[in-house]
């Protein structure tokens, strides 16, 4: 049984895993429908977004993000193995604007809606603000948000703000 965080990490099997590693951390990496820079983008992802690598074909990797979002990313912008630990996370740290909070118990306990697709008419689900989640990417006017169960959903960018510090 591992006694330290480092020992625990050493036991984790990172085979087939990578993280987004753009040399410009303010930029994001496209997930594309085909292994071609001109194909449709399914979103752009921040540094340290974890991806499962299903296949590598030349300079492209077919990846899955979360449970079921898959497409192609350029391998030169992915970090593998021990290099993954060196990538700084670029996920934005934002707060939900108060008028979009549902079932409010207090300032840290409330629900909010996320959408199954990046449009306001898509099916929506309530998530709880107290549960851990990450803003991993963007598509159009939506952030892509992933919870610890690897569910990827969408939230309008204008529902979130940087807060008062």
Please place each PLM-identified region on the residue numbering.
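Beta-loop motif signature
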Residues: 5-6, 14-15, 22-59, 93-144, ...
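Boundary regions of SH3-family modules and the immediately adjacent low-complexity/disordered segments
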Residues: 1-17, 52-54, 64-99, 146-165
